[in-house]
UniProtKB/Swiss-Prot annotation:
Its EC number is 4.-.-.-. This is Chromophore lyase CpcT/CpeT. Belongs to the CpcT/CpeT biliprotein lyase family. The lineage of its organism: Bacteria, Bacillati, Cyanobacteriota, Cyanophyceae, Synechococcales. InterPro entries: CpcT/CpeT, CpcT/CpeT_sf. Covalently attaches a chromophore to Cys residue(s) of phycobiliproteins. It comes from the Bacteria.
Length: 196
């Protein structure tokens, strides 16, 4: 792995909450936890991503494995994977035994749903690869995902929206702008030294 990826993962890994935003604007923003935990026994750069609502912390509504790879100097690609059986690994973020059972064959690569990340003066900026080809089925309808994030220090902002493939109108996602998360736990110490 490269120094660029190591630096990115050290900045990323941890637990984040948008509690302040959710409490100030409860009709517009749910209280959500984002968690990024290294999966040491998989390929270098493999991170477990969990998203849960604060009201239901033991049942993630999104569970992914992202894998960081530097394609060209300074540009990181985050390969995005889902689980064949996500319920088997719903406790993996905090349960090491469960996490150690994750195997490559448990994962499904999500075509066209990978991120490109660049480090700029104000932190790391990530965007879904262009092309409007990351298809998300929501409420019985196919939409394409437009997604971005900005990581600076202990602050992480994200914006995910689904659009109609024909009209390009927004079908779902935040109507009030970005979600703003604050890191509440650092997990960089869980990154294997061989990754850095």
């Amino acid at each position: 792995m490269t120094a660029t990826i190591g630096h990115f993962l050290q900045n990323l890994c941890g637990e984040y909450s948008n509690q302040k935003q959710a409490f100030e604007n409860p009709p517009l923003f749910a209280h959500i936890f984002l968690r990024y935990k290294p999966i040491e026994h998989l390929q270098p750069g493999s991170i477990l991503l969990e998203q849960t609502y604060a009201v239901d912390p033991k049942h993630p509504y999104r569970l992914r494995v992202i894998r960081a790879e530097e394609l060209t100097s300074g540009i990181i690609k985050l390969w995005n994977h889902t689980f064949k059986e996500p319920d088997r690994f719903s406790s993996a973020t905090f349960d090491q035994d469960c996490r150690e059972k994750i195997r490559e064959e448990d994962l499904i690569l999500l075509d066209h749903c990978h991120y490109q990340v660049r480090q700029l003066d104000d932190g790391f900026h990530g965007e879904l690869e262009p092309g409007c080809r990351c298809i998300v089925r929501r409420d019985g309808k196919e939409t394409y995902l437009v997604s971005s994030f900005h990581l600076q220090g202990d602050e992480l902002s994200t914006l995910d929206r689904g659009h109609d493939p024909q009209t390009h109108d927004r079908c779902w996602g935040s109507i009030a702008g970005k979600f703003h998360f604050q890191r509440i736990s650092h997990w960089a110490e869980n990154i294997p030294e061989t990754w850095l």
